[in-house]
Amino acid sequence: MNSSPPPANSANGDTTNNGENGQDLNLNFLDKIRLSAKRDAKEDEGEELPTELNTINSAGGFLVVSPDKLSVKYTNTNLHGHDVGVVQANKPAPIKCLTYYFEIFVKDSGIKGQIAIGFTKESFKMRRQPGWEVNSCGYHGDDGYLYRGQGKGEPFGPKFTKDDAVGGGINYASQEFFFTKNGTIVGKIPKDIRGHLFPTVAVHSQNEEVLVNFGKKKFAFDIKGYEASERNKQQLAIEKISIPPNIGYGLVKTYLLHYGYEETLDAFNLATKNTVPPIHIDQENAIDEDDSSYALKQRKNLRQLVRNGEIDTALAELQKLYPQIVQDDKSVVCFLLHCQKFIELVRVGKLEEGVNYGRLELAKFVGLTGFQDIVEDCFALLAYEKPEESSVWYFLEDSQRELVADAVNAAILSTNPNKKDVQRSCHLQSHLEKLLRQLTVCCLERRSLNGDQGETFRLRHVLNNNR
């Protein structure tokens, strides 16, 4: 096992002239900084939810919507089949979620009880019951039938009338519509309508009146419990997949090796000593532990220095052990280390020293393609009395130190003389991370096949939901 660095003048260790792969390796970390700036904004980016009824786009001649826009009453006389009072929500159902659900409460079933609940497209004809037209579906109270895209319904569930709470929902995971009555699911059907759908309510005979609940009040149906059950189904399906213990062991081990977490690796090996079958993971899955173990102690020590904010010491160690990494003072690794040194000075309030350091080391990157925006963001730290509360707060997070440590780690791994230039970009991620990236792509592809509807895969959310 080769865990020592190559000679300082090793041609194979030159990270400054590795062609496109070396350049991609370096630029990857600059892109990660830019993503840090957008990370929380993207994760918190929500959708507008339906909150009330749309009084502009409705069959206004046959119904009256209350001032709070949460109840509707049929006030006309039903003389024709198309004298329907239809009203949609003010916004379409959200699509970046596991489920969507809303309810109505039948305050008065009127003369005929021809109340309906369902989903329609924005272009739906507002004098037709939901389900009578294409691209719509509706559960009707007078016969308990489900209508979807035509005037003829199909047996579906019980009728509903005065004092009943009836709900309509979309399960994006199973691609189904489902409907409830008084807190119990009465049926579900395949969701064969693409695009944005609006929660829709219809009344069709004199004095029919319903109250609409978009979630401001407690639902009769336990939607949170339903979602938990759906997630549990997904988890059980995953757990049925049999994976040999040594596969998971190998992935975790090479992850720890890749990032130089030597002490954690020792503890992990000790904890799994008597539980993992003695099968050599390399032969089974082509995971090369020798490559991941390369310069392990050096990488561990340098990571710790960066994580502690000891940038001067880290630079000195790199100069001593891997001068080829820092010989170009305008390389990405040097840039990241100098940025981090500047950040550490700002962190402890040494602003004047930070200004001087910035003029000496960061000014050389001003105007260089790929660096300018990050330099400006770094300098912006000086403009705030409390930079940790500013728009560039992420520079002061521990994750920023980890990112710089990862860049140094990858640069050292790329000096491995046993690796060809074309293989060096593989040091950007461990095998475990590559697997998770593939999983993310597969989940995105599945979501694309469902019309870009449903939850997007976020590992952090998955882990939190399965604790």
UniProtKB/Swiss-Prot annotation:
InterPro entries: B30.2/SPRY (IPR001870), B30.2/SPRY_sf (IPR043136), ConA-like_dom_sf (IPR013320), CRA_dom (IPR013144), CTLH/CRA (IPR024964), CTLH_C (IPR006595), LisH (IPR006594), SPRY_dom (IPR003877)
Cytoplasm found in the keyword field: yes
Domain of life: Eukaryota
Region (Disordered): 1-25
Compositionally biased intervals (Polar residues): 9-25
Domain B30.2/SPRY: 31-219
Domain named LisH: residues: 244-276
Protein family: Belongs to the RANBP9/10 family.
PANTHER family registered for this protein in UniProt: RAN BINDING PROTEIN 9-RELATED (PTHR12864)
Protein name: Ran-binding protein M homolog
Organism: Arabidopsis thaliana
Encoding gene (name): RANBPM
